[in-house]
Every structure is written in structure tokens, then in C-alpha cells.
Amino acid sequence: MNTLMKIQLVRPVFRITLRNYGKPERFMWCQKEYARAPKVVCLDGNEIPVIGLGTFNSPKGQVTEAVKVAIDAGYRHIDCAYVYQNEDEVGDGVEAKIKEGVVKREDLFITSKLWNTFHRPDLVKSALENTLSSLKLKYLDLYLIHWPMGYKEGCDLFPTDKDGKTLYSPVDYVDTWKAMEKLVEEGLVKSIGVSNFNRRQIERVLEVATIPPVTNQIECHPYLTQKKLIDFCKSKDITITAYSPLGSPNRPWAKAGDPVILEEAKIKEIAAKKKKTPGQILIRYQVQRANIVIPKSVTKDRIESNFQVFDFELTPEEIEIIESFECNGRLVPLLNQYGHPHHPFEKDEY
């Protein structure tokens, strides 16, 4: 699919060009200036706001306020996960804004993820119910299999043996997927998808699915543009959700001397030319690729800034510069999980 799509906004006026996306009607732009993010229409007809608030590695005690600030700033998409251990704070923020009358539940798009210790089909529903309880919600808009790799069932999020090696579950993610489909049938989730799946793993899911995944949430930034995987997913009408779009500079395992995409001189030059921040440039880059993007922040100014990316356009030349940083630079490689039969990156598969 090589559709060239040009979409015109009413206010502020600009044109955005998206290549290799497919059906023009599947990327809808809202007409209200900054009031709402554009939405991607998924293959099941459900709509996902193109910018969401990420909550990975958000400090305890700060998440509730971050969610409230985000909703006030216009965000309607919140991305969370059981393993982040802050879903209760996300729920408090959402509940507060609903009680204030700022939003209704149906205005929001809430995503969470099934953790690796709950891959066994009989555990999937109870895992979701725990998440719903923490979030104080009756349903999720989107539920993802967080990783294709199952871990040993139990209370430990990262179960290990006496030598520190991760203990695996023999469950195949295709069996987990069938249990995910039942959640849709029961009305507990509206859409289901995957995260960190490579091409072959998605193909295996599609082979058994009666409800196909609507999105693949993957690491995506200029050091890792994921062009092959994105093209494959979009050929199957699977949207992309980009995590770590700013290069995850505060990731706990970062080492001194690791490159920081926000500090790259060429990115800063583009930002200065546009009178924008480097972060806004990187978020806009994902938006122009028709990718959903979920930057994380707990800082009010940054949360608001990350949302203000709809009043400018990157030129093809600027996009070429941004993509020149591609180096297969994966920042979330899960090296300590090498050896798992379902590790998505060990064989450098896309």
C-alpha cells in the first residue's frame, strides 16, 4: 500500500503527509485547536487518540497528579500496565477528573497490559480483573499482551531461581491470545493487541485469531525506526503504538556515555528552526508516520509541551535527518531474558 495521504486541518492550518499508511479514512483529525488529539481508527472500528500519556517508570506518588494534569491538557489516552505497579494512582487520577466533570468515562481511552506471569489462559481474566479493580474501571478500551514471553506463574513479577536466572512458563502466547479474545466477548475490554511482538509472532497470532490484534506497541525512536516491522503491521491493518519515543533517557539501566537522542545536535537544530523543543520534534515525527505515541512524563510543563505538536509539520528533508540516526539502537533489549523460546529480539528478528 503506497497511498499518499494529505490531510488538511481547519485550525491551525497545516498539511501533514503520511506515506505507506493505507486507507485515508482510517486516520481522522479532530478540528478543535489543541482540544483533542487526532485519532487512529483501528480495524475493529474503535478509535485511539494518537497521543497518550505513558506511565512506565513514573515515580510513586506522582502519577495521580500527572494523570490529572494530562487530562486537563487535553489528553484522552492513558497507557498503563500491571507491571508498572502504579495502576491504582492512574485510577485515582481518572476518577478525580470524572468526578470533577472534566471528562466522562467514555471520553477516555485507557490501555493496560497483561504481565508475563499471567500468560496461562486460566489466569488471564483474573489478571484483568485485578487491573480493573486498581483502575476503578468496569472495562478497558485496550488490553495488550505485554511481551510474548511467559514467566513462571506466581506472585513474583520477575521469578528467578537460586542463581538469578528467570524462570519461564511453557505457555505459548497463541493460547494466551485465545483467552484474550474471551475478554472482548465478555465485554470487559473493547479491543485487544500485542506489545513487543516480532513479525513471525504476529503471524502466528493471526493464524489462530478470530479477533485480530488492533495494535503492536513497540519501542520506536530515531535510533530504532522499526521500518520493516511497521510496514508489515500496517499491511495487516495493525496500528503501531510507539513507546520510548524520546529515547527513554531516564531508563533505570541507562549507562554513562549512552547516546541521548534529545541531545543530538541535528535534532536540536530542527527544534530551534521550528521554535519547538527536541521532544516535540520526536513526538511529531511519530505522528507524521501515523503512529500512536505515548511519551512519559510527570512534569506539568513537559506533559503539556508533549501534547502541543499539531501546529507544525516536519519537511521530508527534516524527516530524512531524523531517520539518519537509525542504528538498530534498541534501548529495551531484555538481554537477561535471552534463551526464552519466545524472546522477540534475540535472533534480531523484526
From Swiss-Prot:
Which Gene Ontology CC terms are recorded? cytosol; extracellular space; mitochondrion; nucleoplasm
Task: Show the GO MF annotations.
Answer: aldose reductase (NADPH) activity; all-trans-retinol dehydrogenase (NADP+) activity; allyl-alcohol dehydrogenase activity; glycerol dehydrogenase (NADP+) activity; indanol dehydrogenase activity; L-glucuronate reductase activity; prostaglandin H2 endoperoxidase reductase activity
Q: Per the record, a Pfam family? A: Aldo_ket_red
**Gene3D superfamilies reported in the protein's UniProt record:** NADP-dependent oxidoreductase domain (3.20.20.100)
* Gene Ontology biological process terms from the UniProt entry: D-glucuronate catabolic process to D-xylulose 5-phosphate; fructose biosynthetic process; polyol biosynthetic process; sorbitol biosynthetic process
Top enzyme class of this protein? Answer: oxidoreductase
Catalyses:
an alditol + NADP(+) = an aldose + NADPH + H(+); all-trans-retinol + NADP(+) = all-trans-retinal + NADPH + H(+); 9-cis-retinol + NADP(+) = 9-cis-retinal + NADPH + H(+); 13-cis-retinol + NADP(+) = 13-cis-retinal + NADPH + H(+)
Which top-rank group of organisms is this from? Eukaryota
| Active site residues per record | 84
Effect of inactivating the gene: More compact border cell clusters that are delayed in their migration during oogenesis. Integrins fail to localize to the cell surface in border cells. Impaired IMD signaling pathway response in the fat body, but not in the gut, upon Gram-negative bacteria infection. Conditional RNAi-mediated knockdown in oocyte somatic cells slightly delays border cell migration and produces a more compact border cell cluster. Conditional RNAi-mediated knockdown in oocyte germline cells has no effect on border cell migration but results in an elongated border cell cluster.
Protein's cellular compartments: Cytoplasm
Keyword annotations for this protein? Cytoplasm, NADP, Oxidoreductase
Q: Where is this site: Lowers pKa of active site Tyr?
A: 113
Q: Where does NADP(+) bind?
A: 244-306
Tell me which residues bind substrate. Answer: 146
EC?
A: 1.1.1.21, 1.1.1.300, 1.1.1.372, 1.1.1.54
UniProt keyword Cell cycle present: no
| Stimuli inducing this protein | By oral infection with Gram-negative bacteria; induced in hemocytes but not in the fat body.
Write out the function statement from the record: Catalyzes the NADPH-dependent reduction of a wide variety of carbonyl-containing compounds to their corresponding alcohols. Displays enzymatic activity towards endogenous metabolites such as aromatic and aliphatic aldehydes, ketones, monosaccharides, bile acids and xenobiotics substrates. Key enzyme in the polyol pathway, catalyzes reduction of glucose to sorbitol during hyperglycemia. Reduces steroids and their derivatives and prostaglandins.
Q: Which family does it belong to?
A: Belongs to the aldo/keto reductase family.
**The protein's name in its UniProt record:** Aldo-keto reductase 1B
Q: Which organism is it from?
A: Drosophila melanogaster (Fruit fly)
